[in-house]
Amino acid sequence: MSNQMNTMDIKEILKYLPHRYPFLLIDRVLDFTAGESLHAIKNVTINEPFFVGHFPVAPVMPGVLILEAMAQATGLLAFKTMSSEPSPDVLYYFAGIDNARFKRVVEPGDQLHFEVKMIKERRGIGVFYGEAKVDGELVCSAEIMCARREISK
């Protein structure tokens, strides 16, 4: 068994995810095992556009964007599991969420760690469990579904 870690820098992430600024919410993948799990990070800075209005006096990352970032990490794991290479003709859509729970706020200067695990896959639909943490402390957890779709041009 190899101890080699599978990582993805931002250049590789951009090949898999269609998201771009200001909606690309994953900065790096620290490790992944196709069909099993993925560990990604998002560095949260005061320069994030959502902090202008959420909230100017006490900036907090919106919970829906924490879930979106978790869904993007899930999409990367789905791509690495259910497809061989990135393709402009294939997308993984956020198809559902269950049991989302928030435990603490995320503020500028925090580094979000996303751990997503594959639960099952059938007919292009994947079910995953994800957690977001800051400094080892649970921020959010959820079950996420994503669906593989070919894009017709």
UniProtKB/Swiss-Prot annotation:
Keywords per UniProt: Cytoplasm, Lipid A biosynthesis, Lipid biosynthesis, Lipid metabolism, Lyase
EC number: 4.2.1.59
Major place of residence: cytoplasm
Keyword Ribosomal protein among UniProt keywords: no
Superkingdom assignment: Bacteria
GO molecular function (one): (3R)-hydroxyacyl-[acyl-carrier-protein] dehydratase activity
InterPro entries listed in its UniProt record: FabA_FabZ (IPR013114), FabZ (IPR010084), HotDog_dom_sf (IPR029069)
Gene3D superfamilies to which the protein is assigned, alphabetical: Hotdog Thioesterase
Reaction(s) catalysed by this chain's protein: a (3R)-hydroxyacyl-[ACP] = a (2E)-enoyl-[ACP] + H2O
GO cellular component: cytoplasm; membrane
Enzyme class, UniProt record, top EC level: lyase
PANTHER family xrefs: 3-HYDROXYACYL-[ACYL-CARRIER-PROTEIN] DEHYDRATASE
Family according to the record: Belongs to the thioester dehydratase family. FabZ subfamily.
NCBIfam families to which the protein is assigned, alphabetical: fabZ, PRK00006.1
Protein name per its UniProtKB record: 3-hydroxyacyl-[acyl-carrier-protein] dehydratase FabZ
Species assigned in the record: Shewanella amazonensis (strain ATCC BAA-1098 / SB2B)
Organism ancestry: Bacteria, Pseudomonadati, Pseudomonadota, Gammaproteobacteria, Alteromonadales
Gene designation per UniProt: fabZ
